[in-house]
Amino acid sequence: MDKFRVYGQSRLSGSVNISGAKNAALPILFAAILATEPVKLTNVPELKDIETTLKILRQLGVVVDRDATGAVLLDASNINHFTAPYELVKTMRASIWALAPLVARFHQGQVSLPGGCSIGARPVDLHISGLEKLGADIVLEEGYVKAQVSDRLVGTRIVIEKVSVGATLSIMMAATLAKGTTVIENAAREPEIVDTADFLNKMGAKITGAGSAHITIEGVERLTGCEHSVVPDRIETGTFLIAAAISGGCVVCQNTKADTLDAVIDKLREAGAQVDVTENSITLDMLGNRPKAVNIRTAPHPGFPTDMQAQFTLLNMVAEGTSIITETIFENRFMHIPELIRMGGKAEIEGNTAVCHGVEQLSGTEVIATDLRASISLVLAGCIATGETIVDRIYHIDRGYEHIEDKLRGLGAKIERFSGSDEA
């Protein structure tokens, strides 16, 4: 099992190119199941979760290829299997997105109950109830969610009980081929939903309101091919901005969009960072200063993103002052804090709240990554700590950050990947 060895006390500065958003690329890849003609996708990151998704699509009968430029070419015209099997699905909860397009286009589909990050309850019941309201018959049997419908799904008004990005995407995909009109109320508003809707509309869907809490989908009989470029990854962008903020550095994030990160940029400025934005870049300069502590409360978009909570927890652990972090989206999402405490951080956890007391310096040690965003916070902690830090279970990072050690080295980090069996 691979690990990272990180040598600390680096000031991270330079320019970094931001990859395509994993959280947009995954639903878009599954949405390609709906198309009767070939689709070309660009700016698709090279990640473990993307590899798993492409394997699932191949299993279904989609012809998948990456050309010399890195573009992903998909032809779903001859899908002949309708099951996403356990051996592929077990590592990635996003695989539930295969179900909606299969049922919408082929009137049947089954997906093994998914895995992924172990950060609290992420039930698929909202996906299931949405498909049922569109007319699908669904049973949970032998570890699989099995769905079928005798004819086309039928549009209706669906109020999502709790704001859910995943369920919003599932219902939106399914409704594109349903008879009549579907209205999604209390829809999630994330930029990745807007990007998926843009992709579906390029294929001939009729979706309006994506990015608001009220999405309307006029069903069509078929979707055709298109070309689409995946939006930049706002969470990767925020992560590299944090890298500069905690190390007193200056980082320019290229090929990104500031308008998807308003809540994060506001908090970075509150922490004392100088942040400048252009149409396609964000520059953060700490001018060599230590950040100030900032209170964080996660919320659905356009609120503060839960996927940036771990990175800001690290910032607060090395900031001047005391801060309160409240996690409202997921249970069990403070697993990075005990590891940061082992590095000399000071914090107390009570329920969904953490109180962080800033310290001047962290110390390198061996730590264990528990989920995707927790793991990157530990790597960044290693970059600024004294001595050497070993980060174990970095397969979590490979699920969501493209070429992370190369990008960090480009900013001045001293980091290397090694196999656990190579350790002396």
Curated annotation (Swiss-Prot):
Q: Which protein is depicted?
A: UDP-N-acetylglucosamine 1-carboxyvinyltransferase
Q: Which PANTHER family match?
A: UDP-N-ACETYLGLUCOSAMINE 1-CARBOXYVINYLTRANSFERASE
> What role does it play?
Cell wall formation. Adds enolpyruvyl to UDP-N-acetylglucosamine.
The UniProt annotation places UDP-N-acetyl-alpha-D-glucosamine binding at R93, R122, P123, V124, D125, L126, S164, V165, G166, D307, I329
| GO cellular component terms, A-Z | cytoplasm
- Organism per entry: Haemophilus influenzae (strain ATCC 51907 / DSM 11121 / KW20 / Rd)
Provide the active-site residues from the annotation.
Answer: C117
- State the InterPro entries in the record: Enolpyruvate_Tfrase_dom (IPR001986), Enolpyruvate_Tfrase_sf (IPR036968), MurA_subfamily (IPR050068), RNA3'P_cycl/enolpyr_Trfase_a/b (IPR013792), UDP_GlcNAc_COvinyl_MurA (IPR005750)
What are the binding positions for phosphoenolpyruvate in this chain? K22, N23
Whichever gene encodes this chain, its name is murA
Q: Lineage of the source organism?
A: Bacteria, Pseudomonadati, Pseudomonadota, Gammaproteobacteria, Pasteurellales
